[in-house]
Amino acid sequence: MKFIIKLFPEITIKSQSVRLRFIKILTGNIRNVLKHYDETLAVVRHWDNIEVRAKDENQRLAIRDALTRIPGIHHILEVEDVPFTDMHDIFEKALAQYREQLEGKTFCVRVKRRGKHEFSSIEVERYVGGGLNQHIESARVKLTNPDVTVHLEVEDDRLLLIKGRYEGIGGFPIGTQEDVLSLISGGFDSSVSSYMLMRRGCRVHYCFFNLGGAAHEIGVRQVAHYLWNRFGSSHRVRFVAINFEPVVGEILEKVDDGQMGVVLKRMMVRAASKVAERYGVQALVTGEALGQVSSQTLTNLRLIDNVSDTLILRPLISYDKEHIINLARQIGTEDFARTMPEYCGVISKSPTVKAIKAKIEAEEENFDFSILDKVVEEANNVDIREIAQQTQQEVVEVETVSGFGANDVILDIRSVDEQDDKPLKVEGVDVVSLPFYKLSTKFGDLDQSKTWLLWCERGVMSRLQALYLREQGFANVKVYRP
């Protein structure tokens, strides 16, 4: 099988040296992502496209899906590469490929040609289109808005029969821009802002301020791992967790009620800037949107920015909530955000929307900054790829089984789309489907006399969810890894 990768248009208008660098980086990213599916896979770069050739036909859908999620790709063409002799040979091959697809439909033919030939692209379009129209009685030519567009590419003595076109996410290849550190909470805003910077070519690391214990951190880990695995797995990234409960306690004790929200955000920026400096990261990313909450007015945002020289990027600054939720739905983080445990460690009864710098600084003089330094020093930093291994250690009390007993039921916790694409069928045991994002609200409705064996394809999500359910008091859960 063969795929032709078309570049994001902004790459094609770069200077020659920059364009070549971007293409080289994108080629490496594609190799890094796809090597998990087929080790014999070949990735070949050209000036205006990248070829992906693979032998394992069983991995076709997985490879195609992975390509649509790699930043830098505008669209993917799934093609059949065959030799041809003349224009009539092109027609015959097109007829064999498209006959069933064109029956009862309107169509047009579009041809791209490279190399020296005795015919032009328009001549091929007319010849092939006329032939298809004659040989398929129920088909009809329609040059504008047809039901089916027959795409053909002619390159020297090769014909590319385009079997399908699939849109990519566009943007720049990860690694073409510098690293950023996303302040992730697991909600709608921070997950979307992280995605937007990945799509723009940045390697996104994650910094999480834990205000609510292990369950909260587990939820945020799931979101960060999902974003990385889905859009950024070509690169290694860090997940840094900072226990911010001591900082919150100090703020509650020492800071005036109305100033708490701004002071908390300033402390988070200070801490994140220290982490960024430690790892050579150039900018912070937040999901703040103008006017969404009291701390996100222009006055307050300016005061928050003042505590650090590190650049703070806010890709959602002009977005409304509905737009952000729609983007979260598109990238697959909406369900995470809706079920994320929320912890409001600092709740002001009358938060200021126009903080005064002198007042904020006066309140912060009462704060013991050694507490902030200590929590940053003790921050837990892991390679995001190790989240699965670390989770396995943390859920050592949750048994992992490869078989099942008479009272066991397998619980498939994959997303609905994954379940539809690859339904799980195991002989000798019942299989129940309940997507991971519904476990927190729906698991209690299941038959608690049964032992539930949580299963997902890679085992990461099942272990995380098993730990979460254990913390909620459910002892009848195990992890199923056949």
Curated annotation (Swiss-Prot):
Domain (THUMP) ranges: 61-165
Q: Which CDD domains match?
A: PPase_ThiI, RHOD, THUMP_ThiI
Query: Has UniProt tagged this entry with the keyword Transmembrane helix?
Result: no
GO cellular component terms attached to this protein's record: cytosol
| Active site (record annotation) | 456
The species is Salmonella typhi
The record's GO molecular-function terms, alphabetically, read: ATP binding; CCA tRNA nucleotidyltransferase activity; tRNA binding; tRNA-uracil-4 sulfurtransferase activity
Residue stretches making up the Rhodanese domain: 404-482
Q: What is the protein named?
A: tRNA sulfurtransferase
SUPFAM superfamilies in the record, alphabetically? Adenine nucleotide alpha hydrolases-like (SSF52402), Rhodanese/Cell cycle control phosphatase (SSF52821), THUMP domain-like (SSF143437)
Record-linked NCBIfam families: ThiI_C_thiazole (TIGR04271), tRNA uracil 4-sulfurtransferase ThiI (TIGR00342)
Binding residues for ATP? 183-184, 265, 287, 296
Q: In which pathway does it act?
A: Cofactor biosynthesis; thiamine diphosphate biosynthesis
Q: According to its UniProt record, which protein family does this protein belong to?
A: Belongs to the ThiI family.
Does Magnesium appear among the keywords? Answer: no
Per the record, the GO terms for biological process are: thiamine biosynthetic process; thiamine diphosphate biosynthetic process; thiazole biosynthetic process; tRNA 4-thiouridine biosynthesis
Which Cys residues form disulphide pairs? 344-456
